[in-house]
Amino acid sequence: MIHTVLFDLDGTLTDSREGIVNSVKYAIEKLGGPMPDQQTLLKFIGPPLQDSFMEYCGYDAETAARGVDIFRERYVPIGQYENMAAPGMKELLERLKARGYVLALASSKPEALCISICERFGFTPSMASVTGSPAGSNGDKADVIRSVLDRLGLTDADLSTILMVGD
């Protein structure tokens, strides 16, 4: 039986396409690279940004890391606000919590941004944990999920009671 539900943020709890795509475009323009098509730009949503810059723009690790820094120049003050909650999501989280489910966020997005976004949309009161990538990490999703499980006091023996919603 499921007792704990982990949610991803981008594309699950929120529609963050506009802010992410606009910030990726900003970074690519600043780096002087050719602009990928819209379908490719949408692939930046979800995975760690450095990996996406390397895969979809052909950047080496150093250039991709600069791309992430430039992305954040725009995303932190502007892009995170070009975002909206999925319709009915706050109410859904409240209902799930009221039914006894333990809810948590697990995102490869930096944790400070996860906290800010969850607070803005009113998700935080429903969450037992809001967990993102630590500052300076590469945003590995498996590491984030392990961190959430540790924060919730869950072990491998509990895995059959956990559901992940999103990527």
Predicted features along the sequence, with ranges:
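Short beta-strand immediately N-terminal to the catalytic nucleophile in serine-hydrolase-like folds
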Residues: A106, V165-G166
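Metal-dependent phosphoesterase signature
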Residues: M54-K90
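Active-site neighborhood of HAD-like aspartate-dependent phosphohydrolases
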Residues: M1-K43, M54-C57, A61
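Short, acidic loop-to-helix structural element flanking the phosphoryl-transfer center
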Residues: P77-L105, E111-I115, A142-D143
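Acidic di-acidic motifs
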Residues: S16, G166-D167
